[in-house]
Amino acid sequence: PREGAEDRASFQNFSFNFDSASGIIYTVDVTKPQGEKITITSMADGSPFRMDKIYKVALNSYRGNGGGELLTKGSGIPQEDLKDRIIFSTDKDLRFYLMNYIEKKGTMNPKALNQWKFVPEKWTVPAAQRDSEYLFRSVQ
C-alpha cells in the first residue's frame, strides 16, 4: 500500500498494470533498478530469445493503445507510433472471446505455466506470503 495507507485499496500501483507474459521464460529481479529488472532466459519451448529479432505479441486494447505506460515509458515507444504497430485488431473485446471459448469447451482446468518468477526468492517468497495474507484476510 501507499505509505501511511490503512486499506487494501490504497496500493501505489493498480494491480491491472502488472502483466505477465506467456511464451517466454523470464525472471523479475526486485533488486535491480527500473528498466533492468526483467531478464528473458529463453522462449517457453527452450529456443533462445534473441534481442535482435522482431516478435509478434498479443495485447489487449488497453495495453496496445498505451494503457499503463508499459509501451510508452517502459519500452520507449512514442504514443503516436503505437497505432502503426498494431497489425490485427478484433471488433469484440477479450471477454467476448473468452466467454465464447468457455461456452464451447465447457469445464476448464486452468494451470499455472510457471514461466516466470521474482528473485531473489529469499526476499520475494516471504513478501508474497505477507501480501497474500494482507489482501485476502477475512473481512470482519
Q: Over which residues does each language-model region extend?
A:
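Catalytic centers of hydrolytic enzymes
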Residues: 1-140
